[in-house]
Amino acid sequence: MQVRRPLAILPHIGHLYSLVIADIFARYQEILQPNRHVEFLAGTDEHGLKIQKAAEAKGLAPDVFCSQLSDQFRRLANKAQISHSLFMRTTQRSHYKTVESVWRQLNSQGLIYKSNYSGWYSITDECFYTDAQVTTTSNSNAVISSNSSSNLNPVDSLPPVSATAVPSTTISLESGSAVEWHSEENYMLRLSAFQPSLLTHYTQSSTIFPPQHQHDIVEILSSGPLEDLSISRPRSRLAWGVPVPDDPEQTVYVWFDALLVYLSGIGYPWQAGTGLGISSGWPVNLQVIGKDILRFHAIYLPAMLLALGLPLQERLLAHAHWTIEQKKMSKSLGNVADPFEAMDKFGVDVVRYYLARVGGRFRDDVDWSQTQLDKHHKEIQSMLGNLFLRITSLKIQNRLIGVLSRTLQEIHQDSEEGSSNRFLISALLELPDKFKASMDNLEVSDALAAIIDVLRLANKTVNDTAPWHGSTLPEDVYATYTITLETLRIAGICLQPFIPDTATRLLEALGVDVEDRVWENVQVDMGKKGVKKVLGVRLF
């Protein structure tokens, strides 16, 4: 599991989104295979021209500036209960060694050459664009600093280096960022050498999700020869970065550098004969990125991996962005949502739930809304929190005294056809397969919906049977109580990746041992029998 953080003065909600989505899948794997170690890499990309200029503007040395910013993302990850096992910074010496090793390996294969290169350069995106990838706009409010909610553009949410009203601006069609014409001597990577292999890979496997993104990559690879990639910048223009091995007048291109953090984080280059590599976390099972940096991860990184003789990523999740009133979040527009403020106001798990429930389809951009956040807070509070308090009320507990115990199997058989109890047990029996299928297909929102649907049915069952009411037969009180607690137990296990603190408190209150909070215990215990007194706790 791998996700990286760009640097920012203050992280916005899009940064938290990527971390939470990656964390959900990491925690899911820990539940699914508790004996398998999950390596979860997060971190910050800290080189590049924009960082260099921003540090200069603040009168700080770049390393001091980067340390301050990286600390913000560590704080974000810690507050959001992100379960990363590794946090890498591209300014670490171990990362420099990885970049230098990869450069030398590619150079020794004749894949790197020096050439004069001209193109449209974006400081924000830290890359060159061709004539076909840019356009001229007469918009006087052209955005100089484009702050996407993706999480791998190294400096996507730093304040603009300059933001000046201009009569016309040349911008990237892909990102909307301003570009300037540059001509300079750079080192180039023979990207076209890997085009046939990449095209074969993507036409024979389902690697990228959502599928439309894989279609886009196949179209790029099929539409004509790939241009070789500029992988260095003159030291005179970019001093803040990894020096090119054996050429101190050149600095390694920030994306060549940044993409290799996936390898440096798990110790590449591995020493021969150590057995490391696959056992250390490669190939990665899943990378979580923003859709705007897809080509870096779907073309550039795989080309480098092929050159190194390493297997490609197994799956690549390129999620959509969070917007404000259908506009991309941008400090220059003043519409950046503060994740710390949201978590302080609504609670960490409520924000995590909202990001997954609303943003878990990944196909289309989603609008960040305080109103919607409040709505989903009430949803999970009602469906889960209130259900737990209702079914464990003292009035219902007292009605269970002396009642004859029955198993869930017996309750199911004794329930009338079409009754709420029978519907709930049937839905609960189907939940594990529905949930797992959605998670395995990277459909986070659908997985949550499956849980909420069962919880909603459990609430209906409690309403229909009214176990607190004196007219309800004791055996019906017992049936509803037993089924509802089993629903909460299974829902609690499934909800651990999404709302870990709340799920833990629920399972503790239900008396579920830690070793029993894994996938093999998600199946309905149809043989469960006996009244168990449970004291409800407030979850939200």
Please place each PLM-identified region on the residue numbering.
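N-terminal, positively charged nucleic-acid-binding surface of large information/translation enzymes
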Residues: 1-201
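Structured secondary-structure scaffolds
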Residues: 1-34, 41-42, 94-98, 171-397, ...
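Basic, alpha-helical terminal appendages of large translation-related enzymes
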Residues: 1-4, 8, 39-43, 59-60, ...
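Short acidic (Asp/Glu) and glycine-rich catalytic loops that position anionic groups and cofactors
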Residues: 80-82, 322-323, 332-333, 358-368, ...
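Short, surface-exposed loop/turn segments at secondary-structure junctions
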Residues: 85-89, 366-371, 469-478
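A glycine-rich, aromatic-flanked flexible loop/lid motif
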Residues: 354-360, 387, 391, 398, ...
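Long, amphipathic alpha-helical stalk/connector segments used for oligomerization, subunit docking
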Residues: 367-372, 376, 380, 394-421, ...
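C-terminal amphipathic alpha-helical
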Residues: 380-389, 443-449, 488-502
